Amino acid sequence: MSTEDLYQEDVEMLDDYEDPSTEQHWSEEDGEPSGYATAEPDDHAAQEEQDEPPALDSLALDLTLRCGELRLTLAELRRLDAGTILEVTGISPGHATLCHGEQVVAEGELVDVEGRLGLQITRLVTRS
């Protein structure tokens, strides 16, 4: 089970959960919820929440950089040797996809970063 599956299960559980202590009871007389001091958000508390990173921000995720796929027969695989060039189809040179498990996170171009391989993001994949 991936971390994404666990997260999705947690979200579904939270969506199904209704806390009776957070239910608002409306007063017919003044049209406002009873049992609450104010309906206005506390600006100071909201600012503190923005300053603090979410609790899960330090969670490390294993991501995969994919630059193409190919299919070889077992015989072709056995014949591989140093210097063999394999043709990768379905992707342009320098293009790669950043994935978490099977979920695509972003796409980009492979770049040189001071002698090391890097990925310059060209498109983030939005979740719907």
Curated annotation (Swiss-Prot):
Dimer-dimer interface: annotated span: 78-81
Function: Component of the type III secretion system, which is required for effector protein delivery, parasitism, and pathogenicity. Probably participates in the formation of a C-ring-like assembly along with HrcQa.
Organism lineage string: Bacteria, Pseudomonadati, Pseudomonadota, Gammaproteobacteria, Pseudomonadales
Regions of compositional bias (Acidic residues) in chain numbering: 1-21
Database matches in InterPro entries: FliN-like_C (IPR001543), FliN_T3SS_HrcQb (IPR001172), SpoA-like_sf (IPR036429)
Pfam families in UniProt: FliMN_C
GO biological process, one term: bacterial-type flagellum-dependent cell motility
Entry note about domains: The HrcQb-C domain interacts with the HrcQa C-terminal domain.
Name of the gene encoding the protein in the UniProt record: hrcQb
A Gene Ontology term for the protein's cellular component: bacterial-type flagellum basal body
Family: Belongs to the FliN/MopA/SpaO family.
Protein name, as recorded: Type III secretion protein HrcQb
Region described as Disordered: 1-57
